[in-house]
Amino acid sequence: MEKLLLLGDEAIAQGFIDAGGSAINSYPGTPSTQITEYVINSKQAKEQGVIANWCANEKTALEASIGVAYAGKRAMTCMKHVGLNVCGDPFMNAAIIGTKVVLVVVADVPSMFSSQDEQDSRFYGHWAMIPMLEPSNQQEAYDMVHYGY
């Protein structure tokens, strides 16, 4: 396997591509924007036919990924913490019925650095009774996304 030097967002995107991801649907918002941009600009993703979409908001992005997952393909949605509030309804519905979709929330937990508010979205994972992972470095970010599929 080729060794790469990647930022955290890039490691998440590369893990998705290497896992055979089919579609990424996102709403732009720093710092999660870089994940989707990496997929859009990736030669490997283009060769694999990965579809990347910017959506009207986080709710429609997650709903699009849920639709892809219903079709049996691997999908991911990326957003920052406040976006999770916007897509709360489809998030809980997907958790209840067991939809296999990966949701990546970036720039979370107290001590905000890239947002207008501060929240701890880990409570969403507990509330929905779904796995919630917290990588501590780029390799863990890659591995968690790659093996998560």
Question: Which residues fall in each region the model found?
Answer:
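Thiamine diphosphate
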Residues: 1-140, 145
